[in-house]
Each structure stands twice: as structure tokens, then as C-alpha cells.
Amino acid sequence: MITIYKNQLNEIALTNDIFRRDINLLYRFRFYYPTRKITKEGNFKTIEYFYKWTKFTINETLNEFLLLGDIDLLQSNSQWEFTVEYFDVGLNQWLDAYSDLVTIN
């Protein structure tokens, strides 16, 4: 079980210059983990584990102790993809802002 704080997202944002100045811009993040499972036929089947998107705005990140949520990633010593996206109103779609592999111990 890990806890993600909004100040951690701010730290990533400052380091990687992903958040824009528009404080009302909507962002979302999630963890994603693809794994492979052996089927009866001996073939590999890809099983995808991911956690639902958690949405937030920059306004909400001003309180560093405001929790985004507790996330149970189930598997220790595994690498998950941590992704942040922002919503572009003009294009009416979510666009990538940041992605990185996170090792969970």
C-alpha cells in the first residue's frame, strides 16, 4: 500500500516542467502494470493491471497534505508505469504530460 500526496505530483511537475500555469486545467494520473500469464496452451497472455484515473486541478494541489488516495499495488518489488495527463479543451481530449516507471518495494 502506498500513499500519493499532491505535493509529490507538484515535485514531479517542477522537475519535469509538465504542469502549465492555468490553475484550472484538469489533470489525471494512474498507475499501470502489464504482466504476462502462461495459459493452458503454453502461450503467453498479457494481463493488464491498472488503477482508475484520479483527477485533480492545480488549485487542489496547493495543500501538500491533501491525499489523492491510498493505492494498493499488490505486488512488491515490481515496476509500475506512473502516468499524468492533462485535458486539452481545444482538442477535447486527454494528452500525455508525464510518464515514468516507479519501483514499488
Give names to the regions the model predicted.
Residues 29-31, 56-58, 82-84, 102-104:
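Hydrophobic beta-strand residues in large extracellular and virion-surface proteins
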Residues 88-105:
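Short beta-strand elements
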Residues 19-41:
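A short, compositionally biased N-terminal segment around positions ~18-40 that is enriched
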Residues 55-76:
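Signal that preferentially marks extracellular ectodomain short beta-strand elements
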Residues 37-60:
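Solvent-exposed serine/threonine-rich low-complexity stretches and specific carbohydrate-binding patches
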Residues 1-24:
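Contiguous beta-strand segments within globular domains
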Residues 36-40, 63-65, 90-93:
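Short, surface-exposed beta-strand/loop "edge" segments at domain boundaries and coil↔beta transitions
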Residues 27-30, 71-90:
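Short, aromatic- and glycine-rich surface loops/edge beta-strands on solvent-exposed regions
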